[in-house]
Amino acid sequence: MLFRSLGAFFTLVSLPVMLAVAIGIKLTSPGPVLFKQNRYGLNGKQIPVWKFRTMRVMENSAVVTQATRNDPRITRFGAFLRKTSLDELPQFFNVLQGTMSIVGPRPHAVAHNEQYRLLVENYMIRHKVKPGITGLAQIHGFRGETDTIDKMEKRIQYDLEYIQSWSLLLDIKIVFLTFFRGFVGKNAF
């Protein structure tokens, strides 16, 4: 309940920024402002996760291709949004809906989830808690593209560590560190 209240607070505070981002997207590329992708949430239930659109509108495909550094699909304004993590702001609406938390393991696209559950031991344990906008893995530099199994295994290790050692103090620490490490970093693109 505390984090839902904080989600409401952050949503209200970020509304002017969200409006500016929405205008920026509309002025710089055709297509919708928001992008919705199904991901797995608590107990492996599929949930729609909202983000600001950072890529050119392409045909809808069942194949989900991860964005990569210098990906030609990413717009110039979209690159800025990704670098600063402003593309994640609509996920506060997911927090208000109760499908996400501010802190928790980041939700992965359904196609990626199906792939990694077969390759990474204990992968599915991460669905024992609500997914988050930020998490322990993100403040340790694991955000953006996961182009190797080794990177995904390390990311999952942080997710499992978070679940095993959860506390309100840990969540506060992660939120605090997200502002200094998570939003802008070498792995952000």
Language-model-detected regions and their locations in the chain:
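A hydrophobic, helix-centered structural microdomain
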Residues: 1-59, 94, 168-189
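C-terminal terminal-structure detector
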Residues: 122-189
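Short, hydrophobic secondary-structure boundary micro-motifs
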Residues: 21, 35-36, 103-105, 111, ...
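Short, glycine-rich, amphipathic interfacial segments at transmembrane boundaries or analogous
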Residues: 35-73, 134-157
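Gly/Ser/Thr-rich helix-start
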Residues: 8, 32, 42-45, 79, ...
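Aromatic-acidic/polar surface patches that form glycan- and anion
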Residues: 13, 70, 82, 165-168
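A short, structured surface patch at a secondary-structure boundary
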Residues: 67-130, 174-182
